[in-house]
Amino acid sequence: MNIFYLDKDPVKAAKVQYNKHVVKMILESAQMLCTAHRFYGNNNVPYKTAHLNHPSTIWTRENANNYKWLFRHMMHLGDEYTKRYGKTHLSITKCWDTLCHLPPNIPQEPLSLIHI
């Protein structure tokens, strides 16, 4: 599980990803976001808990702004995937309508430094 935090702006960070990272990071982002939902009690998400104690997964669920950053980044990685490969990534199709909502009771705090 990784987050390639290449820019503070999640859109810019998505645009500068290597092709292989665009493909893989959409799935990993979706898994971390689903894990955040499960951590806060919402089990109605497409992916099972994955790497619960990995620093990137912990960062994702730390607060609402971290979660929103990764969700926005994942969606723009999806846009990059579509531009580069001419199709929609399956994880975007499976997850966007669920993951666009914050997990219940996630703390409302400022965006925190990412754990590298």
Go through the PLM ranges and name each one.
Residues 1-82:
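An N-terminal structural lobe/cap that precedes and organizes the functional/catalytic core
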Residues 104-112:
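Conserved NAD+-utilizing ADP-ribose enzyme module
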Residues 114-116:
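Conserved small/polar residues in nucleotide/adenosyl-binding loops
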Residues 68-103:
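Charge-dense polyanion-binding interfaces
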